[in-house]
UniProtKB/Swiss-Prot annotation:
Organism per entry: Borrelia hermsii (strain HS1 / DAH)
Annotated Gene3D superfamilies: Translational regulator CsrA
Functional summary from the UniProt entry: A translational regulator that binds mRNA to regulate translation initiation and/or mRNA stability. Usually binds in the 5'-UTR at or near the Shine-Dalgarno sequence preventing ribosome-binding, thus repressing translation. Its main target seems to be the major flagellin gene, while its function is anatagonized by FliW.
SUPFAM superfamilies the UniProt entry points to: CsrA-like
Quaternary state and interactors: Homodimer; the beta-strands of each monomer intercalate to form a hydrophobic core, while the alpha-helices form wings that extend away from the core.
Family from the record: Belongs to the CsrA/RsmA family.
Phylogenetic placement of the source organism: Bacteria, Pseudomonadati, Spirochaetota, Spirochaetia, Spirochaetales
Protein name: Translational regulator CsrA
Length: 78
């Protein structure tokens, strides 16, 4: 992990197409701006974690549904 220090109105470049700018620094928060191509997904980590958990639940539900469908299929094809 790379750790950098930046002041307000300074920025960081990632590759040639992503720029992270420090807009404002307050007592307990930092406001940043991120310029990136539209195909790059940018999410707050807590939102990403929620999405990841919901996807896991969905996959488990899909597995259960597939099992139920298979059982129905087997039942009607006896």
């Amino acid at each position: 992990m790379l750790v950098l220090s930046r002041k307000a109105n300074e920025s960081i470049k990632i590759d040639s197409n992503i720029e992270i700018s420090i807009l404002e620094i307050k007592k307990d928060s930092v406001k940043i701006a991120i310029k990136a191509p539209e195909n790059i997904k940018i999410l707050r980590s807590e939102i990403y974690d929620i999405i990841k958990e919901e996807n896991k639940k969905s996959i488990l539900q899909d597995k259960n549904n597939i099992h139920k469908i298979k059982n129905l299929f087997d039942y009607f094809n006896k």
